[in-house]
Amino acid sequence: MQNEKLRNVAIIAHVDHGKTTLVDQMLKQGGVYRENQETVERVMDSNDLERERGITILAKNTAIQYGDTKINIVDTPGHADFGGEVERILKMVNGVILLVDAAEGPMPQTRFVLSRALELGHRVIVVVNKIDRPDQRIHEVIDEVLELLLDLDATPEQLDSPMLFCSARQGIASYSPDVPGTDLKPLFDTILSYIPAPEADLDQPFQMLVSAIDYNEFVGRIAIGRVERGVLKQNQEIAVCNYHDPDAPAKKAKAVSMYEFQGLGKQPITEATAGNIIALSGIGDITIGDTICAPDCVEPLPFVKISAPTMEMTFSVNDSPFAGREGKFVTSRQLRDRLFRETLKDVSLRVTELEGATDAFNVAGRGEMSLSILIETMRREGYEFQVSPPRVLYRTIDGKKCEPIERLVADVPSECVGAVIEKLGSRKGDLIEMTPVGSRMKLEFLIPARGLFGYRNEFLTDTRGEGIMASVFDSYAPYKGDLNRRSTGSLVSFETGESVSYGLFNAQERGALFIGPGVKVYEGMIVGVSPKQEDITVNVCKKKQMTNMRAAGSDEALRLVPPRKLSLEQCLEFLADDELLEVTPENLRMRKTILNHEKRMKATHGGKKK
């Protein structure tokens, strides 16, 4: 039996293709807002970081009443680094909306998430968005989407997907690119007619897979998932099967509070039926992947296999001379608790304690983006710590050392193609496809993940800021040999103190600086970048020696070049193997692992002699 009054659908799109904006318009036209209610753009991006970066990190749930049918909408992250979120969310729905930019076409992350949806047998509605862009190329994009579906072995039914043409910003959709729409009615109607209603076996014992965890300081953990079968009433006895320990006996609990999603919030309910997406609170240490079921019929549900991490970083307690000055949480215990707490929400994250060290932890994730989001989130919460440069995780396959390979798509101006191909070639990248798109060129590469470390800044320089680049994990392949991570060295502070104009003026002749005057520095702190490959020590605290012969006002004013300000991602890309990033709520400071100049020289030259 199917619950015809219900549809569960997820939206798949690449970063910045308008996914959250489309959900905003669906909420408006679905009557979630009162007519006089002030609305915020991109309401589904509820987290500060999401709003700032314009990306969705955590999958969100909402629901719209369209006629007498309730449509549960799940807004998924568009970045492959958050693939752990994407994969388990797809288990909650019966179909997907594939949102594609009318100019950019399908991107690598779109491919990644779509392949997972097709494997699960989901039906797909293709929505070509931003049709009002002056550089739109709708017909080529339609062909690219069909090619992508063929590449991913879509079934004949999935290949025959309906196509809609939309401007999410204007809140319009139509069945033809030549006939402008007036509202999103075509999209709502297509969801009802094409996405199957969820199976609803009400007579069987209750069963639900936990696909997401929310947290509220008043009620604790909230388990979110789709009811697979049966009915659950408030205060009914339930059993919880532990996903991480399948042999452990099921834990008894009670369904204290239940909610369903309505608009932007949750509404308390007294009964949950099969097919609906609900939230349950009152179950202590429940985690993602657990099965909640009736006590007299304990049957764990299979959990979607989450792709393994491909990259790791070491998080450790800050041991710089400025340690403990700016953070609220600085101890190894606090750092450990916070990292392990994150694994409860993010199933694709792995945290392990470093052997022989009580204050360092290896954190493995799906990419630089997911790890940098974790660092920035912890920083805003008041944590102070230090991190190593990212490292790829190697595997041994058939006795050979293998490394993660990324599929990279770069959209660049035609005159910049040579520089991009040359740089990526030197980083062991193989060009596999080259497609002209108007006055631009779309390049596709297979490149080792480590070959992309530190490349994004070079890419923006080589394309004069006009290039678009995106990559996604493709596969593991035999190790491609050594690679120079960085062609530049660091300018390293020689002493502890405060930077002054005279010291900076002399230092800027050796390279580009990251700091201006009046900044507190310590010995071993990185204050700039040197164009040569070796590090150079500089004294940015050096003051000018005054003599009686010289009048103070007769000196020529010192002209300082404005310092380069690096973002968190740029700092992580910049780090060499013997460097660390100190992260505090107020500052990001790059430093050498060995701070003392003499000890560092001894260690370096000692290494060369061996």
List PLM regions with ranges.
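Interdomain boundary/hinge elements
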Residues: 39-42, 126, 152-164, 198-209, ...
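P-loop NTPase switch module centered on the Walker A-proximal segment
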Residues: 1-100, 104, 144, 213
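Helix N-cap motif at beta-to-alpha junctions
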Residues: 231, 284-285, 365-371, 414-417, ...
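A short, contiguous, amphipathic alpha-helix enriched in charged residues
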Residues: 320-343, 557, 561
